[in-house]
C-alpha cells in the first residue's frame, strides 16, 4: 500500500497539484507538489542603486514539497522519492494577483512584469522532517515594488537514466534529458512600502524544522511587529482572503510586544522620598580644609597690618585658641590714622613700606617656637616666638632661624626686589563683634636663651656652562668674494686670491697654485719631463 502524501489540514493554505507520465519502459509515475508554507507579506526593496544589497525577503519563506509515486494511482502507488535517480529544481516567477487595467497611453513601464530579486531557483533537499520527501525552500526572494502578487513555481527535471525518459520529447527547445514537468501557484500576498510595512513575525515551526536539518533559513525568535491603531471596520484590502488574519491570531498569543507608554504599570513611579530636598550644599563651612585648599597657587594676598591696640598692655591679637584651628574669612578695614613705626631690623631682611590694611585671620594657626622675632608696637618692645609654616613652604630657600621683624615675618610679599603693589580692596565689611580678644602673654612664649646666630643661605654665582660647539659650514660669502656685475662675452668671476694673474698659473712652470676649501692658497709641484 502506498504511503499517502503528507498534506496539512487546511487545504486553503496548502495548494496541491499532480501530474502523471509514462516512461519508455512503461513505468507509471505520479508527481505531486504541495505548497506547505505560503508567503504572506514583504517589504518593497525599491529599484535604486542599493536595491541589490538591500534585501527584504518574503516572510515567511515559501516551502514546496515534492513526492514521486510509482503505481497505477496515488493511493495505490509506492513513494520512490528517495530512490528515483533524477535531479529536480524549481524556478520562481512573480505575477500580479489582479490584472492591471491598461491606460490610454501604453508606457513601457506599464507592460513590464514586476521585478523579482534574490535567488529565484532552488534545488531539492531530501529531508526527514516533517515527513520524508523532497523540499524546495526560497529564503531569499524580494520584490521591488509594493502591490498584491502571487508566486508561480515551475518544476524542471534532469533525467539521468534513459529508461526514465519520456516516450516523446515534450519541448524541443530544452536540451536532451531536461524536461519541464509542472507548475504551481501560491496564494496572493501583499508587498508594503517602508512606511506601511507592519513588521515581521516570529519564524514558523516549519522554518525552524527545516533550519535544524541544515537548510539556510533566517530564524527569528521574537516578534518584530509595529503596534498601530487601526480604524474600526477597516480591513486589509490587499489581503485577498489569504489567511493572513488567521496567522496573526495564531501567533498573537506568543507575541512579546513592548507595552505602550500609556500603561501605568510599565513606567516606574517617581520616588516619594524628600531626602534630596533637605540636602545641604557641598561647601560646608565646618569642613576641614584639605591640602589643596591650604596651599592655593594664586598670587599672594594684600599685605596685612596690625590693629591698633586698645591699651598699652595689649599686643597683636593672634594665637587665640578660637581662631587657631580654622581660617576665617579675610576682612580688610581701612585705618587712615594708624601708623606703626617698625623697630630696628634684627635679621637679614630690611623692613618694607607700611600697609593700611588690617588682617584679622590667622594663617591656619601653625605656630613654631624656634625663632624669637621682635614685635614692634606702641608698648615696650617684647620678645616673642611665632612662626608661620606657610611662609616656610612658599619660599624657595629654607628659612634660617635668624631674627626677623614681625612685620617682615608675616608679610608674604615683603621682598626687597618686589615692592607691594596697591590692590583694590573690597568694600569694608562691618565687624561682627566689637569685643577684643585677650592679650597674648608674651612672657610665657619668650625663651630665656639668647637668639641663635643668623644662618644665611649659601648662595653663590651660578657656574658658567661650557660653550656649546654648534657645528656648521661657513658661508660661501665669508670665504669667496662674488661680484654682482653682469658677465658678457665669456667673462668669468675674478678670484681675489690670484689678483689679475691667470688662475692656477705661476711664473714657475713647475709649480701651480690652487684654492682650498677653507679659502687658503696652496701650491703644487709638477713633475719635470725632458724631451730627449
From Swiss-Prot:
Skewed-composition ranges (Basic residues): 217-229
Region of interest (PEST), residue spans: 431-462
Keyword Transmembrane tagged: no
Comp. bias regions, Pro residues: 295-307, 417-428
Gene3D superfamilies assigned: Velvet domain
Primary localization: nucleus
Assigned keywords, A-Z: Cytoplasm, Nucleus, Sporulation, Transcription, Transcription regulation
Subunit: Component of the heterotrimeric velvet complex composed of laeA, veA and velB; VeA acting as a bridging protein between laeA and velB.
Domain notes: The C-terminal PEST domain is a region rich in proline, glutamic acid, serine and threonine residues that is required for the light-dependent regulation of development and secondary metabolism.
Role noted for this protein: Component of the velvet transcription factor complex that controls sexual/asexual developmental ratio in response to light, promoting sexual development in the darkness while stimulating asexual sporulation under illumination. The velvet complex hat acts as a global regulator for secondary metabolite gene expression. Controls the biosynthetic gene cluster for beauvericin, a depsipeptide mycotoxin that functions as a virulence determinant. Also regulates chromatin structure and transcription of siderophore biosynthetic genes and is required for infection of tomato plants.
Protein known as: Developmental and secondary metabolism regulator veA
Source organism of this protein record: Fusarium oxysporum f. sp. lycopersici (strain 4287 / CBS 123668 / FGSC 9935 / NRRL 34936)
